[in-house]
């Protein structure tokens, strides 16, 4: 019997997959626990529509991320802060600081977790990476100057 999995089932398959299961296993285990439903024509049509909608949504998200990456590519962020005699900062510049500066300077809100960088503790010029989507990222420059 062909069934559509409604949830991930260990050693069987993932949500949305169409698998072949024995009649007894499907009727006595999968169906009562709402883990699967029978793969009828109407259920298959609904599943295909859901997959198509998810694919379109993902493509739209990737397109938006690529557009944003194009806008941010090569942009510079200049930070003026107090610096000690040896060039060390009083405090440090973190991804949270960079995210708030991107928001103020370019009016683009980016989650701090999407900014890939080490904590900046010295004055100078740095390259950071902003991962907007798993396959989409861009590089930006950060300049740390004395106040």
UniProtKB/Swiss-Prot annotation:
Tagged with keyword Transport: no
InterPro entries associated with the record: Ribosomal_bL9 (IPR000244), Ribosomal_bL9/RNase_H1_N (IPR009027), Ribosomal_bL9_bac/chp (IPR020594), Ribosomal_bL9_C (IPR020069), Ribosomal_bL9_C_sf (IPR036791), Ribosomal_bL9_N (IPR020070), Ribosomal_bL9_N_sf (IPR036935)
The gene coding this protein: rplI
A Gene Ontology cellular-component term: ribonucleoprotein complex
BP GO annotations: translation
Lineage of source species: Bacteria, Bacillati, Bacillota, Clostridia, Eubacteriales
Similarity section: Belongs to the bacterial ribosomal protein bL9 family.
Recorded GO MF terms: rRNA binding; structural constituent of ribosome
Protein name, per record: Large ribosomal subunit protein bL9
Entries under PROSITE patterns matching the protein: RIBOSOMAL_L9
Keywords annotated in UniProt: Ribonucleoprotein, Ribosomal protein, RNA-binding, rRNA-binding
Role played: Binds to the 23S rRNA.
């Amino acid at each position: 019997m062909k069934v559509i999995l409604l949830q991930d089932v260990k050693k069987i398959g993932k949500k949305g997959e169409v698998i072949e299961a024995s009649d007894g296993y499907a009727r006595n285990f999968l169906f009562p626990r709402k883990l699967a439903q029978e793969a009828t024509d109407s259920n298959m049509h609904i599943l295909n529509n859901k997959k198509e909608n998810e694919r379109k949504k993902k493509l739209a998200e990737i397109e938006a991320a690529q557009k944003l990456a194009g806008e941010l590519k090569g942009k510079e962020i200049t930070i003026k802060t107090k610096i000690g005699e040896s060039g060390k900062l009083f405090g440090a510049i973190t991804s949270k600081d960079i995210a708030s500066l991107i928001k103020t300077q370019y009016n683009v809100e980016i989650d701090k977790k999407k900014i890939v960088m080490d904590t900046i503790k010295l004055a100078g010029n740095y390259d950071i990476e902003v991962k907007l989507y798993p396959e989409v990222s861009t590089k930006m420059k950060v300049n740390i100057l004395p106040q």
